[in-house]
């Protein structure tokens, strides 16, 4: 289908984009990579009268280090995450997980900020950002504010990002030495959303788990942080029984929507399997 008619705007700065959002209000949508918005427009699920293309704003791109924090511009594309020496060295989970997102063509256009701001539970970066304890810098008419990933996602297509705000950057603490990490994603084919997915970041002290973050993809209206799974592992020995207990805790909070990828029972069971796989893979990487 052909999208409805719209007016096109191409601001050159974040301030200009924010001003346009304030002027045009709910009739406007930001255009990043376009892989989520444009299909919705073709199906008439979204019918904005104005598109604000933020691809020409240089400050929204790039990856840099600020002390122990990695700063990623919201318009940074997936392939830049994969190829970045900074991300490979300091946040290898993001570099590896980006390879599992969609296909090469999409990874050349799709942006990390767009994936997050869209608020779809099947997108990969919401769970990843929760697992790595990311914070999002948002700019609106009253200046900038920083919000944690944990709590940013309110429901399907619903986030804390206001309609007059632009996501500027993602700030992530670099992994400490010895950190283990993994992202396990079950999908039907290359390019598909996850049937179920799990991101894990952990550290150990001897045979004891000293730090653990678990987040789930596409098994609820939002990405989920698994606090119950964390409590079953933190400060405890890493055993088969502890891993199973964490998986059981994840299963208990799943509320997946039924679709062509499977019914609720199947997706819930697969979430438990992804948790176990991710925990074991992350533990094996702990130094």
UniProtKB/Swiss-Prot annotation:
Gene: cutM
Cofactor mode of binding and number, as noted: Binds 1 FAD per subunit.
Keyword field: FAD, Flavoprotein, Oxidoreductase
Residues annotated as domain FAD-binding PCMH-type: 1-177
Paired cysteines (S-S): none
KW Oxidoreductase (keyword) present: yes
InterPro entries for the chain: CO_DH_flav_C (IPR005107), CO_DH_flav_C_dom_sf (IPR036683), Diverse_Substr_Oxidored (IPR051312), FAD-bd_PCMH (IPR016166), FAD-bd_PCMH-like_sf (IPR036318), FAD-bd_PCMH_sub1 (IPR016167), FAD-bd_PCMH_sub2 (IPR016169), Mopterin_DH_FAD-bd (IPR002346)
GO molecular function, one term: carbon-monoxide oxygenase activity
Subunit structure: Dimer of heterotrimers. Each heterotrimer consists of a large, a medium and a small subunit.
Full protein name: Carbon monoxide dehydrogenase medium chain
Cofactor needs: FAD
Catalytic activity reported: CO + a quinone + H2O = a quinol + CO2
Keyword RNA-binding: no
Its biological purpose: Catalyzes the oxidation of carbon monoxide to carbon dioxide.
EC number assigned by the record: 1.2.5.3
Protein residues bound to FAD: 32-36, 111-115
């Amino acid at each position: 289908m052909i999208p409805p008619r719209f007016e096109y705007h191409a601001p050159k700065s974040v301030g200009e984009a924010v001003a346009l959002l304030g002027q045009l209000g709910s009739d406007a949508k930001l255009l990043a990579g376009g892989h989520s918005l444009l299909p919705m427009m073709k199906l008439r699920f979204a019918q904005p009268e104005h598109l604000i293309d933020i691809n020409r704003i240089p400050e929204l791109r790039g990856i840099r280090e600020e002390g122990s924090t990695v700063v990623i511009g919201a318009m940074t594309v997936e392939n830049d995450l994969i190829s970045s020496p900074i991300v490979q060295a300091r946040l290898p989970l993001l570099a590896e997980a980006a390879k599992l997102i969609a296909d090469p063509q999409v990874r050349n256009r799709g942006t990390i900020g767009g994936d997050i701001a869209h608020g779809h539970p099947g997108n990969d970066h919401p769970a990843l950002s929760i697992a790595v304890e990311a914070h999002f810098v948002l700019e609106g008419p009253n200046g900038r504010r920083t919000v944690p990933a944990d709590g940013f996602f309110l429901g399907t297509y619903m986030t804390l990002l206001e309609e007059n705000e632009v996501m500027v950057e993602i700030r992530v603490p670099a992994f400490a030495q010895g950190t283990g990490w993994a992202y396990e994603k079950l999908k039907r084919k290359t390019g598909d959303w996850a049937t179920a997915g799990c991101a894990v970041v952990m550290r150990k002290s001897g045979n004891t788990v000293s730090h653990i973050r678990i987040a789930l993809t596409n098994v609820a209206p939002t990405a989920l942080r698994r606090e119950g799974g964390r409590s079953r592992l933190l400060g405890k020995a890493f055993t088969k029984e502890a891993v199973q207990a964490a998986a059981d805790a994840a299963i208990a909070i799943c509320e997946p929507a039924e679709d062509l990828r499977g019914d609720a029972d199947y997706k819930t069971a697969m979430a438990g399997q992804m948790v176990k796989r991710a925990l074991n893979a992350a533990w094996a990487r702990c130094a």
